[in-house]
């Protein structure tokens, strides 16, 4: 076991065979819905609870906007052409040697929201684009 916990600023994203740099990745959550049930003859004054279906929340990616890089928009446009391109995406948290320590694998992802950077005449920051994806499952592996 390591002496120190992993830092969260060292990560890489495999975007369908291509490694892409991102400023931030969020939404790597696992959640299960809860089913509540109570029958009329129950002596308890509360509902019984049991696990239900898995809820797959969306994952959000943020990165700088680059000249001649229209990948997010091109992928988003496949929705409007009725030929949605689904991708498998792998996010890896890296250890001190740059090797994957924890890996999240996102299955059958497709874009649902694309946000361009806000523009400010007096701004002093990098233009950031944001892509939100829906998916059909997330697994976590400790390497």
Please tell me what each predicted stretch does.
Residues 1-143:
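Glycine-rich, low-complexity intrinsically disordered segments
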């Amino acid at each position: 076991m390591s002496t120190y916990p992993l830092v969260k600023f060292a990560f890489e994203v495999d975007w369908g065979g291509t490694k892409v740099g991102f400023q931030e990745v969020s939404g790597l959550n696992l959640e299960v819905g809860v089913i509540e049930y109570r029958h009329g003859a129950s002596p308890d004054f509360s509902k019984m609870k049991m696990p239900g279906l898995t809820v797959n929340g969306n994952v959000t990616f943020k990165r700088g906007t680059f000249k001649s890089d229209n990948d997010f928009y091109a992928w988003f446009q496949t929705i409007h052409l009725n030929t949605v391109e689904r991708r498998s995406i792998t996010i890896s948290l890296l250890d001190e040697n740059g090797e994957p320590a924890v890996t999240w694998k996102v299955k059958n992802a497709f874009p649902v929201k694309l946000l361009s950077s806000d523009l400010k005449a007096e701004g002093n920051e990098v233009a950031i684009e944001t892509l939100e994806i829906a998916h059909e499952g997330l697994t976590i592996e400790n390497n």
